[in-house]
Amino acid sequence: MAHKKAGGSSRNGRDSESKRLGVKKFGGETVIAGNIIIRQRGTRWHPGDNVGIGKDHTLFALSNGVVSFQRKANNRSYVSVVSMVEAEE
């Protein structure tokens, strides 16, 4: 009577898919209008000049240029897109 008892089912083995958040274009990188600069939850970075914000707080370029990060007096981080002409000056 060599019977093997059925093993119990495990209650582990579930995990959510990663959301691939984070900075997609870093400071000094060239972007074209519509490029996603940052995917984030909440406003860890705020939109500056020539940057729009989506309903999921994604920051994206509104014009062609170079990405610039800065921290203002209110201690918030802002992301801007500086046009190529301004960047050369």
UniProtKB/Swiss-Prot annotation:
Family indicated by similarity: Belongs to the bacterial ribosomal protein bL27 family.
SUPFAM superfamilies: Ribosomal L27 protein-like
Keyword Repressor: no
Keyword terms, alphabetized: Ribonucleoprotein, Ribosomal protein
Keyword Ribosomal protein: yes
A GO BP entry: translation
Region (Disordered): 1-21
Record organism: Bartonella quintana (strain Toulouse) (Rochalimaea quintana)
A single GO molecular function term of this UniProt record: structural constituent of ribosome
GO CC annotation terms, alphabetical: cytosolic large ribosomal subunit
Disulphide-bonded residues: none
Name of the protein described by the UniProt record: Large ribosomal subunit protein bL27
